[in-house]
Every structure is written in structure tokens, then in C-alpha cells.
Amino acid sequence: MFRKFVIMLVLSLLVAAGISQASSASRVCIIGAGYSGLATARYLQDYGLNYTIFEATPNIGGTWRYDPRVGTDEDGIPIYSSNYKNLRVNSPVDLMTYHGYEFQEGTRSFISGNCFYKYMKSFVRHFGLMENIQVRSLVTWVQRTEDKWNLTYMKTDTRKNYTEECDFVVVASGEFSTPKIPHIKGQEEYKGKTMHSHDYKEAESFRGQRVLVIGAGPSGLDVVMQLSNITSKLVHSQHILKSWHIFNQPDFPGNFISKPNVKHFTANGAVFEDDTVEEFDMVIYCTGFYYNHPFLSTLSSGITATENYVMPLYQQVVNINQPTMTFVGICKPFFAKLLDQQAHYSAKLAAGHFKLPSQDKMLRHWLEHVQMLREAQFKITDVNSVGPNVDEYFKALHKEAGVPLLPPVYASVFVFSGKTLLEDLQNYREYDYRIISDTQFKKKYNPREEVCPYDD
């Protein structure tokens, strides 16, 4: 399967419009005003570049802005946010802050999603980014024409289309808006209700119901925790935490049932891989998201953007065929400090602060990275991963572009807090993490109410 990447890469080279690498971009267009887009804008502003953020919704914040609606908004645009009521972050806040704009001392490590959204708005006000953000501007097409990019967008309130020229494009449209629902035998036979976690907004509406939750990623575990005392029956189907019994499994009520993968659905429930049968009223798929870049095509941009991967990207950021286009925020693992580093790298490239290798060298680097992932037993859909060593990735960005080197303690906290999540799902958010040096941190059990230091 990895060989297909090489074939697709060669085909993309045949249609690529060729490399054009300006020393400094006079106009930069950013797609998306979520975490990654805002981080990029701040650095572009630091370097004195002219930029505009095109945001499809009426608000900044991307998935961090809670919206109780599902389906479409007042302009008929899909609700992009996958946020839900009472969400708390699943990584310590020190791993999520923008560089140079840290959270105030004394804040608990696992803040609410609402508090983090307030922090993002405070960041925008502090750096004066709002005047460069164009809301209700849905990007519909991006095309390379000679030495410029033509970016077409629709004003969602008027349905009028406009096209602007850009020297440099940063794609920061996020990866948590297009639900991934796997095909499972018998789905069409099931007569109950189904939904994806993207449309999960609050627990109370499931009170008294019998619910099947599929998936054990961050949203799956959160939904299970929220529903455990609400539903009359809660079935959790997952294959990731096969050894969960060796950890400190939450003290779920008697209505909780853990199951392996669904073998096939029935009219009123499902048969699982252990050949047991359960009935339920609702299925919630917590099965992740697809990439979604409908405004790009290989012919128009030189990039191959599918629902599972975007390629070929040098350093998981730069469009190798057209290096005046970068992507911020589609890499794995999803580590906010990593996104901030990518944003800084993109801004430095747009500002002409460093020069990329030749196309041939970037391609060889990318192919070597793909081979490394293959040897490390990564899946094909993980081709946008930075690899098993996040610290080495930070060092590479620092060495090439002069991006300030992120101390190794951040990666250590990321790994350690993830381990704590598995060991104590019920209480892992009650710990405080405090970074005390470039290599050391402290962890303390400190349950307390939130006092958010930021206003609306």
C-alpha cells in the first residue's frame, strides 16, 4: 500500500505547476480562524506581513467554540465545531498555550473547553488579530496561476463569490469537522437512532436511554464518562483498551457494559465479536474524523488531499510541489504546542527567513519519512504523523527555520499525562502539572473548582 503513495506522488509531479519560492510574501491568505490559523496570524504579524484570515463561520475559535446546534447554522453552513457541554481539555494547559502567551499562574491544568475558548479570544485581543479576520467567508477553491494563488470564497450571508490573489497560502481549516463513520455489517437493519460524536452536545438528552458508544479515543472516553450516570444502560464497544482491566478502571455504575468490536447490527441492537448480544436505543459513533479540503485538487494546487491523508508534505507542513502553500494542524499526534511550532515555521517561510531545500531533496526527505513510518508499524492513514519522536521533530524545525526550540519537558508531559489518562480515567483531570525546568515537571493531585482567569 505504501508503494501507492510513490505512484501518486509521481503523478502529482506531472501536473504540478512548478516551484516558485519567493523570498518574502507580500500577501498571505490563511484558511481558518481556529487554533492553528490564529497562531500563524500572530507570527505573520510579528514579521510585518500583510495577511487575511478567511473564516467560514461568524466566529473565531474553530472547534473550541461550543455551539449547541447541529446540522447547519443561520447561513446554511455546516456546524463545524465538535465541542460539547462540560468539555474539559484532555491535556495539561501548559501543552496548549500559544508561545509567549501562557496561562495565568495558579490555573488548574485541565481547564474547561469554555475557559480555553476565552483564552483564545484574549489572545486575539492581545495581539490585535481581529481586524485581519474576515468571517462568514467560506473558501471554495484555491488555484495556482503562474506565480500567484487565486483564492475564491463565498460570503455565506449574501451567497456572493469573490476571488483574491495571494502570494502565500496557509491551510489551517482543522480536522475535527467531517465525521468518520465506519461501515459495519447490518447497519441498514438497525432501527434505532444513530449519531456521531460531532453532533453530541450534552448528556442530559440521553437520560434513561440505552446507549451504545463505539470508540475509545478522547471523545469516546469523554462521552462514556458523561453518560455513565445518565443512561439506563451504557454499552461501550472498543478495541484500543484491551488491557484496561490492569489499570484503575472507573467505578462505573451497574448499567455499564464493556464490549469488543461490533460484529454486526440487528434490528434492535448488535452482536459483538465475543458473540454476545445487546439491545439499545441509540448508537453514538466516536470514531474520529476525516480530513476535508474540498477547495483543493491535485491539478489546482499540486497537493493530493484525500479524506485520510494530505501529501506530499515536507516536514508535515510544506506542499512540496508548490512550497508557497503550507498546512498547519493536520499532523499527528494532535499536540497544540506542535501546531504552534508549525505555525511559526510557516510564518518564517512566508517571511523569507530561511530557504527550503530543492524539490528533489524535499521529496527524498518525505519518502524517507514514509519509509520510517512503515518500519515503525504506523498505519497508512498515519502518513501525516511526525513520527514516534516528537522531540526530534521540534529539533528539525529549530535547526532548519530557527523556530525556538521547545524544551523536551513538553513532550515528556504529553506522554506522561496520556499514560495517567489510561491509568485513572475517572480522576486524571484532577492532577496539576507544573513545568519547573526544560527537563522536569511536577504532578500533584489537586481537585478543585475552576476559576477561569479570562473574560468573554
Swiss-Prot record:
Protein's job: NADPH-dependent monooxygenase that detoxifies senecionine and similar plant alkaloids that are ingested by the larvae. Is active towards a narrow range of related substrates with highest activity towards senecionine, followed by seneciphylline, retrorsine, monocrotaline, senecivernine, axillarine and axillaridine.
Designated name of the protein: Senecionine N-oxygenase
Statement: the UniProt record of this protein carries the keyword Flavoprotein: yes
Enzyme class, spelled out: oxidoreductase
Similarity remark: Belongs to the FMO family.
Designated gene of the protein: sno1
Residues where NADP(+) binds: G215, A216, G217, P218, S219, G220
InterPro entries assigned to the protein according to its UniProt record, in alphabetical order: FAD/NAD-bd_sf (IPR036188), Flavin_mOase (IPR000960), Flavin_mOase-like (IPR020946), FMO-like (IPR050346)
